[in-house]
């Protein structure tokens, strides 16, 4: 069940859209659920919120969201024994939830359109420096369950991150009745789910393609989505959480050709950035001698994602719609050179070129509302 809540006297209790979200969530014009660039809680999140109405379409909402399921990505512990895999994936070292996300918005919703400013505060907390049954804190082991050496090894201090978003909808366009433009822009630090968001959990990326480099089997591009990374002092780090930054923008122009046909042109741009210390820790973990990297190899975990799509809908009768969507997806990764990698099967362990990747997806949907 997506939404289940009760409302009275301005309060909302239950599973509903976050107070941070826009009315269109992650769907300014698209039908696919993977348009990045901002937050999306269209399947609902457990929350408590209060809305004050000031008249003339002006309102303010403040709420508490449960971040456990939908508002967290990953925290990487970069000790050498927890090695990042071939596509920069790591073991998630997020600790348990200590505090809810504090979220809110100020909204103006009038005949001309809508304007909204949202903000969120999100706590990032990590598990122990070492997970294992025995040994000193400096001896990192790969067990995924806390053991006798875990608590004495300590853990990074929790840090608070957050996000802000500005959203705009313009109605009554001269292009036709019911046409509108929707756009929102977001920035997050330690709350990457507010930018790299889908209807499910935040994705990390691993894509393969062709190559023209001699000796390389294929090309590979990847991007790791995290809220923070850390390297314990006992393993040569500073023991602190380094919060990941992300920013994005997405929007759509929605046009009605006639009462039965409509189209939406939409797009987005998203970026994930690691600070200099985080990059050094990630690259030290990833760039092992076994990868036999090329002379022109550069390690940089930052990445960007661009999306552009078109949807056309036919509504022959009320509450019945046939839709077709085509979307281009571009992954702009920052690694360079080649390396000997062992991705998961069926891909072989061999030499790959680091390269940007593209794909196109087609989606067809029939929707009947009752």
Question: What positions do the PLM features span?
Answer:
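Transmembrane beta-barrel outer-membrane domains
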Residues: 1, 39-43, 95-99, 155-163, ...
């Amino acid at each position: 069940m997506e939404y289940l809540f009760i409302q009275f006297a301005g309060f909302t209790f239950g599973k509903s859209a976050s107070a941070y979200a826009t009315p269109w969530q992650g769907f300014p014009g698209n039908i696919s659920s993977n348009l990045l660039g901002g937050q999306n809680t269209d399947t609902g999140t457990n929350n408590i919120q209060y809305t004050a109405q000031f008249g003339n379409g002006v309102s303010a909402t403040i709420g508490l969201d449960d971040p456990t399921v939908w508002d967290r990505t990953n925290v990487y512990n970069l000790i050498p024994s927890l090695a990042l895999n071939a596509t920069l994936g790591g073991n998630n070292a997020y600790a348990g939830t200590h505090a809810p996300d504090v979220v809110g918005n100020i909204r103006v919703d009038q005949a001309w359109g809508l304007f909204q400013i949202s903000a969120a505060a999100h706590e990032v907390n990590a598990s122990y420096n070492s997970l294992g049954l025995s040994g000193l804190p400096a001896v990192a082991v790969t067990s995924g369950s806390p053991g006798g050496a875990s608590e004495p090894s300590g853990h990074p201090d929790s840090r608070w991150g957050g996000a802000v978003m500005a959203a705009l909808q313009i109605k009554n366009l001269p292009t036709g009745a019911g046409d509108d433009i929707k756009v929102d822009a977001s920035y997050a630090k330690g709350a990457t789910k507010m930018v790299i968001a889908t209807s499910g959990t935040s994705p990390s990326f691993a894509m393969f393609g062709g190559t023209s480099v001699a000796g390389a089997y294929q090309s590979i591009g990847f991007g790791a989505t995290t809220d923070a990374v850390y390297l314990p002092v006992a393993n040569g780090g500073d023991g602190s959480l380094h919060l990941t930054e992300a920013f994005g923008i997405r929007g759509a122009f929605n046009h009605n050709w006639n009462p039965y046909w409509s189209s939406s042109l939409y797009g987005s741009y998203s970026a994930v950035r690691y600070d200099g210390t985080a990059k050094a820790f990630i690259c030290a973990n990833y760039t092992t001698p076994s990868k036999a990297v090329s002379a022109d190899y550069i390690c940089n975990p930052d990445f960007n994602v661009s999306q552009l799509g078109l949807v056309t809908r036919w509504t022959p009768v009320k509450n019945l719609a046939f839709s077709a969507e085509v979307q281009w997806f571009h992954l702009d990764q920052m690694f360079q050179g080649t390396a000997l990698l062992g991705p998961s099967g069926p891909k072989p362990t061999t030499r790959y070129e680091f390269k940007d990747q593209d794909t196109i997806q087609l989606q067809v949907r029939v929707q009947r509302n009752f």
